[in-house]
Swiss-Prot record:
PANTHER family: 60S/50S RIBOSOMAL PROTEIN L6/L9, LARGE RIBOSOMAL SUBUNIT PROTEIN UL6M. Keywords: Ribonucleoprotein, Ribosomal protein, RNA-binding, rRNA-binding. Pfam families: Ribosomal_L6. Belongs to the universal ribosomal protein uL6 family. One of its GO terms (molecular function) is structural constituent of ribosome. Part of the 50S ribosomal subunit. InterPro entries: Ribosomal_uL6-like (IPR000702), Ribosomal_uL6-like_a/b-dom_sf (IPR036789), Ribosomal_uL6_a/b-dom (IPR020040), Ribosomal_uL6_bac-type (IPR019906). HAMAP family: Ribosomal_uL6_B (MF_01365_B). Coiled coil: none annotated. This is Large ribosomal subunit protein uL6. One of its GO terms (cellular component) is cytosolic large ribosomal subunit.
Amino acid sequence: MSRIGKRPIPIPDKVAVTIDGSTVKVKGPKGELSQVLPPEVVVVQENSSLLVNRRDDSRPARQRHGLSRTLVANMVKGVTEGFRKNMQIVGVGYRLQVTGNKLAITAGYSHPVEIDLPKGISVEVDQKAVPIANSKSQQGFNFGVIGIDKQAVGDVAALIRAVRPLEPYKGKGIRYATETLRLKAGKTGKK
């Protein structure tokens, strides 16, 4: 039995769950999410909790049991609390600007890079520069990608990070706040 899959998912009071065959819909104060689960698992609602069970003990069913439980748990957490991925942008002149559903990133290119934000995803930028650890006394800006769908938040965060990945000599670029960087030593030169 999957250690993750056998744990029940508590349903808060403000959340409504609808199970229609293999489709699970979760509606809460922050929005609504739906997920089609694999046919090897079945979701059962008991009192104020959800149980994810597998239909048989086949290998695909065992593989997808814990995954399905985590997907449903993330939906419940997303519609109640939401998800946030904290990030930092470090570099002289590097900035972020949000206008509507577009994010303009100025990161050392000759033009700002624009990213269309999907529905339900927003970017919150802290306009106050802060010192950044491991980046040779540089200043940077903190920002966060916010949404109710954990996968979409992670996808947008990865897309933003790919615009200017970390540079290992000075520590410039876009990074996750939890990411650690080991700086490389530069050339020593002739003596």
